[in-house]
């Protein structure tokens, strides 16, 4: 399959998996116009829409796409039932689209009903994990988001993280504010800064990369623990994760 990202709004990406014959899967279409333009340009035939959660910038284009393509199947978690979903999915479900198998797992935190879709090597993780960061806790808890991160971290290192926002540069600036002397973080920050200066995308990224530069996956690293302990003494991984999320909220 071919992976394409369609920019939307200020910093969203709408992901599309397409076959050489033009049939395709659309992930989190927050608005219809750029998707319809890409469909026309590439002569795609949409087969399915995958929704990760209920926020408008991820579901806003569903109604218009269903009107244009009445046979399209829309998958999503229970929290998206009023957003045009035709088949509700939950943790542990599996589906096959265009001959490709997808595993669905629950990743609460950003919202309570958030789900991710994994079809090797692609992970469509919505607003759970970003390159260098994690989603805001609008509905869930730090404990829930930490456990969601652990689910993602259990995937193969070559997994491609297809998140829904271009937040990488801001996330790396935050990471540098926490660990300014970390070589991996510095190297990646400079790489990302160069890409964004050229208006190039930083996504997708491998899980292997995230394990090196994403502080939310490194809450048990001694360097980060030492940094946190300069301000407070937190003994548990979840507490350190929550500390990081709070710091990022205020950054």
From Swiss-Prot:
It comes from the Bacteria. Binds 2 Zn(2+) ions per subunit. Zn(2+) 1 binds at residues 53, 55, 110, 127. GO terms for biological process: methylglyoxal catabolic process to D-lactate via S-lactoyl-glutathione. Keywords: Hydrolase, Metal-binding, Zinc. Pfam families: HAGH_C (PF16123), Lactamase_B (PF00753). It is an enzyme of class 3 (hydrolase). It catalyses: an S-(2-hydroxyacyl)glutathione + H2O = a 2-hydroxy carboxylate + glutathione + H(+). Its EC number is 3.1.2.6. Belongs to the metallo-beta-lactamase superfamily. Glyoxalase II family. Thiolesterase that catalyzes the hydrolysis of S-D-lactoyl-glutathione to form glutathione and D-lactic acid. This is Hydroxyacylglutathione hydrolase. It comes from Klebsiella pneumoniae (strain 342).
């Amino acid at each position: 399959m071919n992976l394409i990202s369609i920019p939307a709004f200020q910093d969203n990406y709408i992901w599309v998996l397409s076959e050489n014959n033009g049939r395709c899967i659309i992930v989190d279409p927050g608005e219809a116009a750029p998707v319809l333009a890409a469909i026309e340009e590439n002569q795609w035939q949409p087969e399915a829409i995958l929704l990760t959660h209920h926020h408008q910038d991820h579901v806003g284009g569903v109604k218009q796409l269903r009107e244009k393509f009445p046979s399209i199947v829309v998958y999503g978690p229970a929290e998206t039932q009023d957003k045009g979903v035709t088949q509700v999915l939950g943790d542990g479900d599996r589906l096959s689209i265009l001959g490709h198998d997808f595993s669905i797992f629950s990743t609460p935190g950003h919202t309570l009903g958030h789900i991710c879709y994994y079809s090797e090597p692609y992970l469509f993780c919505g607003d759970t994990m970003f390159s260098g960061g994690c989603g805001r806790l609008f509905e869930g808890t730090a404990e829930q988001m930490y456990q969601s991160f652990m689910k993602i971290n259990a995937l193969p290192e070559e997994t491609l993280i297809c998140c829904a926002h271009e937040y990488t540069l801001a996330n790396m600036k935050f990471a540098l504010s926490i660990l300014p002397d970390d070589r991996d973080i510095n190297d990646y920050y400079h790489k990302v800064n160069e890409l964004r200066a050229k208006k190039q995308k930083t996504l997708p990224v491998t899980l292997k990369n995230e394990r090196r530069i994403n502080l939310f996956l490194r809450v048990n690293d001694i360097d980060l623990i030492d940094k946190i302990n300069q301000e407070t003494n937190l003994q548990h991984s979840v507490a350190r994760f929550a500390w990081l999320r709070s710091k990022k909220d205020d950054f």
